[in-house]
Structure formats: structure tokens, C-alpha cells
Amino acid sequence: SHDVNINIQFGFENPQQVVD
């Protein structure tokens, strides 16, 4: 859901966020 949004927002900045 919104988790994917955060991924695109600063996923490149925080790779770990992509896994979350």
C-alpha cells in the first residue's frame, strides 16, 4: 500500500526501506 510509496519516495536513499 503506502509502503510502496515510501519505497519510491526515498527508497533510493534508504535501500533498507525497500526491503521493509
From Swiss-Prot:
Q: What is this protein called?
A: Unknown protein NF045 from 2D-PAGE
Q: Which organism is it from?
A: Naegleria fowleri
Q: What else is known?
A: On the 2D-gel the determined pI of this unknown protein is: 6.0, its MW is: 33.0 kDa.
